[in-house]
């Protein structure tokens, strides 16, 4: 075969391969972007693997904890504020709004743009009875300056609105920290309650096993019946069942705390135990004082106030549309030209050119668009102001409920302490009487169940005081303030 034909065949093969590759790639993209073919089973497409790989790339390494250290609540809160992704989201949003304010403020300054142009044109020109080759070169530096001299407040309205929106984003950032702190406190106290319930459940199991052992000994001496022993075994099995339930709740509490800290649930975290904490008996605060603080410092309420300021600034911007705006434009140009024509010497010239203009813009008629935009902006202001009143009522009610819950928890703590002491004495007396044959086994198991419930109630009451105290600080907005402003128990 002729070499040219071989080259032609090879070229056609390459073209066919390229066409097949393009068509297959296009088909794969079409399949990847196609909707599920039917509603009766899940979709699995070609793009699923790539998305799954991208999803794995967003995984961050978990926090590392010292296994020998018991972390206190302030240390856990510091870790949560540093590593919980919610604070990062709120922070980036605040930075975005701050940048938007900077963009709005840039309207106070002129806009200056520079451009450099260079070109060469070569061709033939006809002069007299012949053509001559001609070369013309051009080099220009152009500055374009634009500035709004006045617009009757439209620019100022946009700047004020952007500033208020940046302020609202900062308050939202603070509110995110308030929520993260409260979630960490809740998870910590939930874990303390679960750990305390585990201790109580193990003590209950130990008591039930002691009762079972006493029943077995009495049965071996003919002083008890088989039903008594079966009742004791049933109580021990019930105590074991309750212990396993408590262990499961403790695992969940560990996961909740890890989630609040911004790490994976299986992270091992040792925390300061409940017995090392001081449980307050009273609180040196009044509900009126807590309400006043909440209405003055709650970041979500302050965010609402900033929203009102932004809405009012938008009204100012909307009103400015009824008035003219004056713009100034200048475009100085430095130009350099040179030329060469056949049989003639080079020619060159340079100079300053350009222009300037004032432009007055005034919308005379727009089909009531300005009127409706102004009405819309004013309605947004009224809505935002009404939302503040709604938020104030909600905050006052939240503080009232949190304060009431705290007082209730303090009273229940006193009752739980007395209940535990009485139940412990009752159980000891019942078991001793049973060993002497003065009480039956039903009395002992009943006392044992009462003691178990009293232990559980005591743990719950102690952690409930701490939880409700944290809730009051959360509702009043004290958790993100300086320590000097927080209520002291």
Ranges and model annotations:
Residues 171, 175-293, 405, 409-412, ...:
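Periplasmic alpha-helical coiled-coil/stalk elements that build and connect Gram-negative outer-membrane
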């Amino acid at each position: 075969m002729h070499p040219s034909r071989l080259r032609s065949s090879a070229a056609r093969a390459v073209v066919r391969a390229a066409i097949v590759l393009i068509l297959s790639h296009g088909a794969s993209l079409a399949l990847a972007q196609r909707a599920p073919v039917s509603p009766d089973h899940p979709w699995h497409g070609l793009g699923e693997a790539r998305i799954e790989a991208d999803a794995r790339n967003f995984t961050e390494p978990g926090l590392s904890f010292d296994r020998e250290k018991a972390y206190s609540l302030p240390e856990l809160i510091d870790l949560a504020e540093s590593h919980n992704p919610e604070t990062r989201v709120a922070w980036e949003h605040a930075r975005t709004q701050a940048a938007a304010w900077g963009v709005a403020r840039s309207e106070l300054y002129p806009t200056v743009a520079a451009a450099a142009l260079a070109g060469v044109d070569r061709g033939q020109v006809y002069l007299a009875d012949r053509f001559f080759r001609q070369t013309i070169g051009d080099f220009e530096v152009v500055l374009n300056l634009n500035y709004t001299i006045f617009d009757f407040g439209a620019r100022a309205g946009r700047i004020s609105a952007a500033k208020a929106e940046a302020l609202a984003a900062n308050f939202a950032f603070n509110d995110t920290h308030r929520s993260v702190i409260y979630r960490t406190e809740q998870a910590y106290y939930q874990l303390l309650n679960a750990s305390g319930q585990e201790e109580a459940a193990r003590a209950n199991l130990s008591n039930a096993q002691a009762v079972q052992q006493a029943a077995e000994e009495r049965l071996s001496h003919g002083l008890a019946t088989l039903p008594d022993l079966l009742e004791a075994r049933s109580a021990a099995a019930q105590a074991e069942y309750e212990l396993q339930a408590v262990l499961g709740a403790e695992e969940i509490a560990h996961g909740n705390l890890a989630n609040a800290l911004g790490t994976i649930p299986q992270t091992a975290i040792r925390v300061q135990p409940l017995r090392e904490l001081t449980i307050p008996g009273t609180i040196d605060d009044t509900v009126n004082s807590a309400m006043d603080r909440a209405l003055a410092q709650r970041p979500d309420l302050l965010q609402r106030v900033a929203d009102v300021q932004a809405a009012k600034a938008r009204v100012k911007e909307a009103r400015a549309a009824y008035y003219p705006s004056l713009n100034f434009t200048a475009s100085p140009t430095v130009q350099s030209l040179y030329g060469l024509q056949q049989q003639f010497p080079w020619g060159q010239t340079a100079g300053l050119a350009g222009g300037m203009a004032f432009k007055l813009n005034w919308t005379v008629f727009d089909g009531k668009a300005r009127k409706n935009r102004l009405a819309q902006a004013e309605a947004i202001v009224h809505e935002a102001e009404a939302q503040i009143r709604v938020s104030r009522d909600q905050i006052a009610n939240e503080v009232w409920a949190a304060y009431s819950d705290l007082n209730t928890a303090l009273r229940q703590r006193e009752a739980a302490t007395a209940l535990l002491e009485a139940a412990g004495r009752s159980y000891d007396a019942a078991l001793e009487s049973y060993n002497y044959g003065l009480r039956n086994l039903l009395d002992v198991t009943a006392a044992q169940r009462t003691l178990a419930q009293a232990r559980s109630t005591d743990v719950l009451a102690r952690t409930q005081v701490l939880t409700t105290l944290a809730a009051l600080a959360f509702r009043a907005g004290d958790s993100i303030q300086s320590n000097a402003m927080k209520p002291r128990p």
